[in-house]
UniProtKB/Swiss-Prot annotation:
Compositionally skewed regions (Polar residues) per UniProt: 380-390, 952-971, 1001-1011, 1268-1280, 1315-1327
InterPro entries assigned to the protein according to its UniProt record, in alphabetical order: CAMSAP, CAMSAP-like_CH_dom, CAMSAP_CC1, CH_dom, CH_dom_sf, CKK_dom_sf, CKK_domain, PRC_barrel-like_sf
Name this polypeptide is given: Calmodulin-regulated spectrin-associated protein 2
Residue ranges of every copy of the CKK domain listed in the record: 1330-1464
Record-stated family: Belongs to the CAMSAP1 family.
Annotated organism of origin: Rattus norvegicus
Biased composition (Basic and acidic residues): 686-696, 796-835, 1020-1037, 1044-1056, 1167-1233
Origin: domain of life: Eukaryota
Tissue specificity: Present in the soma, axon, and dendritic shaft of hippocampal neurons (at protein level).
Record domain Calponin-homology (CH): where: 222-335
Comment block on domains: The CKK domain binds microtubules and specifically recognizes the minus-end of microtubules.
UniProt cross-references to PROSITE patterns, sorted A to Z: CH (PS50021), CKK (PS51508)
GO annotation terms (biological process): axon development; cytoplasmic microtubule organization; microtubule cytoskeleton organization; negative regulation of microtubule depolymerization; regulation of dendrite development; regulation of Golgi organization; regulation of microtubule polymerization; regulation of organelle organization
Source species taxonomy: Eukaryota, Metazoa, Chordata, Craniata, Vertebrata
Region (Disordered): 374-397, 580-622, 648-712, 796-864, 930-1059, 1078-1099, 1167-1327
């Protein structure tokens, strides 16, 4: 514990305080004390608590503790609740809380329900008198929970932990508040250990290297000692043991972890040397630490610790909520308020200043400092330090009144190599003309306004558990707006110094919300406008917009940043991306997406350039119209968000790593832009990481089990205070899991309903789409072919969607200069069509492959001339629809995955890729990442003509599918320029994720061989004329793209697929019609993904062949079954002959059929391999889930077993006590029957006590009246008056040791009469003695009680001596076992003594004044004598029994006689 010499040490030296032993510790009293102390402190403020309320208990004259009347009155009047509730629940000052009901209602609004033993507490319960304490405790507990949720949220904790922990295990992420608190303590303590390790190493290093370094006295000695001993010596200096906290209460009893935590935050106040950290802690050590903590809290934290030492030491489960609120307050002090003394410890290099001298920097800055330290990249500093300055200049984020956001500004930057649960989006400028504009450094980096979404992107373990952990203040949404967009134009500007042209939407949102732009389901469009996600219903209506690029970005924006899967997605995934690509990505170019991004690999890999977002978008993007209030649709929205987040981090569901734009290759995440010169992470590596990362990658189903299971995950621990009222009952912590069961079922049913609705909708739409496609196929295709010679590059259309292409083509002819704008905007006709046939266009269901071309040429020439205004309008509306659609698609993907898991029939599913993939370009984008490994890897790329490679269908399978949906954007200009690369366009097979790539069984679609449209140009690729700007941009972008392709060695496996498809359809299309069934799709029609966007120049050898896809029957049905993926049921398949689709292919005569066979084989092999991987991943996930469930089960069982053991132990102790008591009684009986005269001499007289069960029967004295005449009381009390007490004996130890239950009871406030009755019945047997030994005494005799009463109460004192003796003699003469004293009235004035026969219930007078006999009707009151107190107490009973010692009769019975009172009578006789 440090040197005693130090003054602080002197202060720390202490004597172990006296504490109550466990056996005497009253748990219920402790709970009441803790709750009241906390409530009073919150109601009045710690400093101003009224004196009489500081200690809620008082002790009465009988040593009984009671709650003080003032406290009781305040509780009954609700004043305390109203005061505290107004503070905690932030109630409107204009409408203060009045009364219990108001507080209960306010809590209910927060989703917290006051329950006492699963029963809702009502105002009546709280008004009851005498006070019903359990109801009040429940009320206080709920207020504490509200306060806890206000102070701490899972998101805040994770954000905080990111500062101190470089690596996250997704399985570790907390799933409720208690877990979050433990997670925080553990992460901080781990970080503290790391710091101490580093300091120790540097110290050793310093001493070893410093020539004239500090010379310890033993330095030379150690030089002489053999190395192995020296090593042991250093080991002895091992770091102190800071235990892991696994059970918040139990592991906190020694104070080690908590004291270490406090030391970390306040190293100058609580030094490590002051803390007792040992492997095995003694009781004294634990008390020392606990005292240290209490001192610290009293001195520095405003007395926030309302526990006694015993409370913290014994840690009863009843005070869990108190402990949580205490920890929440600590978190608030250390991470939010951060007073000057809070200076988190950092590594101090040898000789550096002590921590306490370092400037007080907010933790967030410290976190930033960590990042900076971890990478010396000046680039990072320029990017991140400056933005911070700027944002601070601009006023930083506005603090919302909600404490949830108190954690504030500059999101906590994850430390280097963090497995990003969150990613940071940043700019990687392309070498483009607007590079200069993208001055990234000016961008303000602002912490995510809401921490809500962080956990959503977390791994499946807790995937949705905390989804809706909504801060109790309920102000989530408003606060977000307040912080982020109080005025999209005003405040946003303050966050973003650059004008909107300079920043792409990415920057606006991502930079603003490093921890997750959407965390509260609030999206920002590219201009920072708030867009809230649409509900499912809205999305369903808008489904047709699926393929439209949600926003087309301005080319200039492209230079500034990337989007993951398009603007919407980028927003959605920003939660993940932000942290993901956090500084690490920037500072660690080579691994930008390396292991760091395990959880979010998917996103990381492919950031789609934002250029696709239309410049024309207003700040008032129509997406804004779809705002859904956070509170109103919490269930659905949170689910959506979560799904997004989860998917984003899910390799398969998340948007696949395949970028959707050609430039995907230069992923922002990978910092791949050619200009950046950063080494790109290969997709293969990412894939490998994904496979290894149990968390984010757990297969598609990993993060979302089938709907029911997903919801199960979601609910059990979702203490979502405000989400579902029913659940709020759970507010009291995880212990109330039973309440959640019904909620789980309820939610599961709702999800199931939703799923069915979506499925039905999906099927309808797919059917409609199929028809539409068939109709439009030929026309569209021919139109495209006709126009291909016009010189317009279809690429753009491909990316943006079929419609876009046509518009683009037409416009390109007319206005080359306006090409960019034209490309982004959609033609009116396309839009109309998309609206009329939403299904045909948007939800392209794979049911029938439609030639993308159909859609490309939907617009008529007249439409080409549409003016900008109209196009802009339509673009906006389509984008609006797209945002909704993306949500819906995401939901549908999730549901499909869940369905797959349920069906578990992977082999029977066939995949059909519907042509809807607007253009090969699109596919190319999607697959690029994958194929990058393919031909692109092989082919050298020139900066000018980068050829994006197609990922093989297999590699792209699932991922690309999801990607393509989100990433459909108008291709970038450079994309248009790409030279033909011979490649096969294989559409992604992950049908589920793409509405358009939906799974169909062969039956649904005539089994068609998957046809790959290969556009290849035998001759030199001709470049399409492009607008200058396009040309400028293209080289750099392409370069980036190519680089990324090169870096994806992993994808090279796909090489076999290389086809001669000129991805850049701008080349003449001399393609071989590869009617290649994809391995699995061997017999599946794959819509010719190639969008016939043809380069203006006509392909030299273009043979257009029309192939009836139905003719392409699978060689064997077996192939089809192989295709069936993830157990889609056969029923989904339609009859093979049902539909016949025609595909158009360009055939290259020079291609041999055997090439196709080889490709087919390669595809099949890859497919099988992927299937195996998927299965393996699923199995791993299932095993993990099973293991987790098993753990939970085991813990529950252990808890239950402990309780059982405890119960059994107590029962055993009780039984043992009863047994001993019985034995003792029997021994006493034996003694009575066979008295041993010698015993009396040895026996000590008992002190005052009525517990006769332990008294040996006294022996008859040699002189004086028979023993029976002795008053038992006098015998026991050693009263000097008693006949045989020669001297007053001290209270005998044996008596104290054998306190009978009755004695304990009376101490604890049991009713006196009960105690007395017990003792009298026991005592009668033991004390019976005298001449009549032949008669076995009755166990019910109260003779000795009556003797005691007469001697010490009724006839005490010298005055009554004569009367007393006479009556005692009468008693001895009587054979009766039971006697009754008759009182005059309730004043207990003695009148006479009666005998009572319990069997016959006769009461006859023995001596004194009164009726000869008394009947039941005459009795008015019954009394019991308490020997301890020497007084009678009234028994609230009507029936006379042997346990009664005295009675009164009705007063009218006395009035008739008026006898002289015994006191007058007897003394005269005497």
């Amino acid at each position: 514990m440090g040197d005693a010499a130090d003054p602080r040490e002197v202060r720390r030296t202490f004597i172990v305080p006296a504490i109550k032993p466990f056996d005497h510790y009253d748990f219920s009293r402790a709970k009441i004390a803790c709750n009241l102390a906390w409530l009073v402190a919150k109601a009045f403020g710690t400093e101003t608590v009224p004196e009489e309320l500081r200690e809620p208990f008082y002790t009465d004259q009988y040593d009984q503790e009671h709650i003080k009347p003032p406290v009781v009155n305040l509780l009954l009047s609700a004043e305390l609740y109203c005061r505290a509730g107004s503070l905690i629940l932030k109630s409107d000052a204009a409408k203060p809380l009045l009364g219990h009901d108001a507080v209960i209602q306010a809590l209910a609004h927060k989703g917290l329900y006051v329950t006492d033993q699963e029963k809702l507490v009502t105002e009546r319960d709280l008004h009851k008198k005498p006070i019903q304490m359990s109801a009040h405790l429940a009320m206080i507990d709920t207020l504490m929970m509200a306060y806890t949720v206000e102070m701490v949220s899972i998101e805040k904790v994770i954000a905080c932990a990111q500062q101190y922990s470089a690596f996250f295990q997704a399985t570790d992420l907390p799933y409720d508040i208690e877990d979050a608190v433990m997670y925080w303590i553990n992460k901080v303590n781990e970080h503290l250990k790391d710091i101490m390790e580093q300091e120790q190493k540097s110290k050793e290093h310093h001493t070893a290297e410093a020539p004239g370094g500090q010379k310890s006295p033993s330095k030379w000695f150690w030089k002489l000692v053999p190395a192995r001993y020296r090593k042991e010596q250093t080991l002895l200096k091992q770091l102190p043991c800071i235990p892991l906290v696994e059970n918040l209460l139990k592991d906190g009893t020694d104070g080690c972890a908590l004291a270490a935590l406090i030391h970390f935050y306040c190293p100058a106040v609580v030094r490590l040397e002051d803390i007792c950290l040992k492997e095995t802690m003694s009781l004294a050590d634990s008390l020392y630490n606990l005292q240290l903590i209490q001192e610290f809290c009293q001195e520095y934290l405003n007395h926030c610790c309302h526990f006694s030492l015993e409370d913290m030491l014994y840690a009863a489960s009843s005070i869990k909520s108190n402990y949580l609120v205490f920890m929440a307050e600590l978190f608030w002090w250390f991470e939010v308020v951060k007073p000057s003394f809070v200076q988190p410890r950092v590594v101090r290099p040898q000789g550096a200043e002590p921590a306490k001298d370092m400037p007080s920097v907010p933790v967030l800055n410290a976190a930033k400092r960590n990042v900076l330290d971890s990478s010396s990249s000046s680039d990072f500093t320029s990017r991140y330090t400056r933005p911070q300055t700027h944002s601070s200049v601009s006023g930083g984020i506005r603090r919302s009144s909600s404490m949830s956001y108190v954690d504030g500004f500059i999101g906590t930057w994850p430390k280097e190599k963090r497995t990003s649960v969150h990613g940071v989006s940043f700019d990687i400028s392309f070498d483009k003309e607007d590079n200069a504009q993208s001055s990234t450094p000016n961008r303000g980096i602002i912490r995510s306004v809401s921490n809500e979404g962080l956990n959503n992107s977390r791994a499946s373990k807790h995937i949705r558990k905390n989804l809706s952990f909504k801060p109790v203040n309920g102000g989530e949404e408003e606060s977000i707006e307040e912080e982020l967009h109080v005025d999209p134009h005003g405040d946003l500007k303050s966050y973003m110094p650059l004008s909107t042209n300079e920043l792409n939407s990415n920057e606006n949102t991502h930079h603003k919300l490093p921890n997750g732009a959407l965390q509260n389901r609030v999206l920002l469009d590219e201009f920072g406008n708030q867009i809230e996600t649409p509900s499912i219903e809205e999305a369903l209506q808008i489904i047709h917009d699926t393929e439209k690029p949600p926003h087309t970005a301005r080319p200039d924006q492209i230079a500034n940043g990337f989007f993951l899967h398009g603007q919407d997605l980028s927003l959605l995934n920003s939660n993940i991306k932000l942290s993901q690509s956090s500084p690490d990505n920037i500072t660690d170019p080579k691994g930008a997406l390396s292991p760091i991004t395990d959880t979010t690999e998917v996103d990381t890999g492919i950031h789609v350039p934002s250029e696709d977002i239309p410049e024309t978008m207003d700040e008032d993007s129509s997406l804004r119209d779809y705002t859904v209030s956070l509170d109103s649709d919490m269930d659905d929205a949170s689910k959506f968000l979560q799904d997004y987040d989860i998917r984003a981090s899910n390799p398969r569901e998340a948007l696949s790593p395949c970028p959707s734009t050609i430039s995907t290759k230069s992923q922002p995440g990978s910092s791949a832009s050619s200009s950046s010169g950063v080494k790109m992470t290969s997709f293969a590596e990412q894939k490998f990481r994904k496979l290894n990362h149990t968390d984010g990658k757990s297969s598609g189903s990993s993060s979302q089990k089938t709907t029911p299971e997903g919801s199960e995950l979601n609910i059990p621990h979702m203490v979502s205070w405000a989400q579902i009222p029913e659940e709020s009952g759970v507010a009291q912590g995880r212990d109330t899991t039973q309440l959640l069961a019904s909620e789980m079922v309820h939610l599961r049913m709702r999800l199931e309903e939703k799923r069915r609705a979506i499925e039905a909708q999906k099927k309808k739409m797919e059917a409609a789409f199929t028809k539409q496609r068939q109709k439009m196929g030929r026309t569209a295709f021919l139109t495209v072919v006709k126009k291909k010679g016009d010189g317009i590059s279809p690429l753009r259309e491909e990316a943006a969607g079929a419609e876009d292409e046509k518009v683009y083509t037409d416009r390109a002819k007319e206005k080359e200069s306006q090409k960019m704008d034209g490309q982004r905007s959609k033609s009116l006709a396309d839009i109309k069509e998309s609206m009329e046939n939403p299904q045909g266009k948007w939800l392209k269901s794979p049911s029938t492959p439609v030639d993308p071309e159909k859609q490309w040429n939907l617009t008529s020439p007249s439409e080409e001339t549409l003016n900008e205004g109209e196009l802009l309008e339509y673009t906006k509306s389509i984008e609006k629809l797209n945002s909704s659609l993306h949500f819906l698609q995401q939901e549908m993907q999730r549901l499909s995955l869940q369905q797959e898991m349920l069906m578990q029939m992977r082999e029977q599913q066939s995949w059909v890729i519907s042509p809807p993939q607007p253009s090969p370009q699109k596919q190319i984008r999607d697959f690029k990442p994958r194929q990058a490994g393919l031909s692109s890897a092989a082919a050298p790329f020139s900066a000018d003509s980068p050829r994006p490679t197609h990922p093989s269908p297999q590699s792209s399978t699932r991922k690309s599918a999801s990607f393509s949906v989100k990433n459909q954007r108008t291709p970038r200009p450079n994309e248009l320029k790409i030279t033909p690369l011979n490649r096969t366009l294989t559409p992604p097979r992950s049908v589920d994720s793409l509405p358009r790539l939906r799974r169909f069984s062969p039956s649904q679609v005539p089994i068609q061989t998957r046809s790959f449209v290969c556009f290849g140009d035998d001759g030199e690729p001709q470049k399409e004329p492009k607008p200058k700007e396009e040309i400028k941009k293209e080289p750099s972008e392409c370069k980036g793209t190519l680089e990324s392709c090169d870096h994806n060695p992993g994808e090279k496996e796909v090489k076999p697929l290389e086809s001669t498809v000129s991805e850049v359809l701008s080349q003449p299309i001399t393609e071989t019609v590869c009617v290649t069934p994809n391995e699995d799709q061997l017999n599946q029609p794959t819509d010719p993904p190639p969008k016939p966007v043809f380069p203006p120049t006509a392909p030299k050898n273009v043979n257009l062949i029309e192939v009836s896809l139905s003719d392409l029957k699978p060689p064997e049905k077996a192939d089809v079954s192989v295709e069936k993926f993830d157990g889609e049921s056969d029923k989904e398949q339609f009859d093979d002959d049902q539909k016949v689709c025609c595909g158009f292919f360009f055939k290259d005569d020079q291609k041999a059929e055997n090439d196709m066979a080889v490709k087919r084989a390669a595809l099949l092999e890859k497919r099988l391999r992927r299937e195996k991987e998927t299965q393996l991943r699923k199995q791993q996930l299932e095993a993990e889930m099973e293991h987790r469930k098993e753990e939970t089960r085991r813990k529950t069982e252990e808890e239950r077993q402990k309780k059982e053991d405890e119960r059994a132990r107590r029962e055993f102790i009780r039984q043992e006590y009863m047994r001993r008591k019985q034995l003792k009684l029997m021994e006493d009986m034996d003694t009575v029957i066979k008295p041993r005269p010698q015993v009396a001499k040895q026996k000590k007289q008992r002190p005052k006590s009525i517990h006769r069960d332990h008294i040996e029967s006294p022996k008859t004295p040699i002189k004086g009246p028979p023993v029976s005449s002795l008053s038992l009381a006098s015998l026991n009390t050693g009263d000097t008056e008693s006949v045989h007490s020669g001297k007053r004996t001290p209270r005998s130890e044996s008596v104290e040791g054998f306190l009978s239950p009755s004695r304990c009871g009376s101490r604890n406030g049991e009713k006196d009469w009960e105690n007395a009755s017990t003792t009298s019945s026991v005592a009668s047997g033991t004390e019976y003695t005298g001449p009549k030994l032949y008669k076995e005494p009755s166990a019910k005799s109260n003779k000795h009680i009556i003797q005691n009463a007469l001697a010490h109460c009724c006839l005490a004192g010298k005055v009554n001596e004569g009367q007393k003796k006479k009556i005692l003699e009468e008693m001895e003469k009587s054979d009766a076992n039971n006697f009754l004293i008759l009182f005059r009235d309730s004043g207990c004035q003695f009148r006479s003594l009666y005998t009572y026969c319990p069997e016959t219930e006769e009461i006859n007078k023995l001596t004194g004044i009164g009726p000869k006999s008394i009947t039941k009707k005459m009795i008015e009151g019954l009394y019991k004598y308490n020997s301890d107190r020497k007084q009678f107490s009234h028994i609230p009973a009507k029936t006379l029994s042997a346990s009664v010692d005295a009675i009164t009769i009705h007063s009218h019975l006395w009035q008739t006689k008026r006898p002289v009172t015994p006191k007058k009578l007897l003394p005269t006789k005497a």
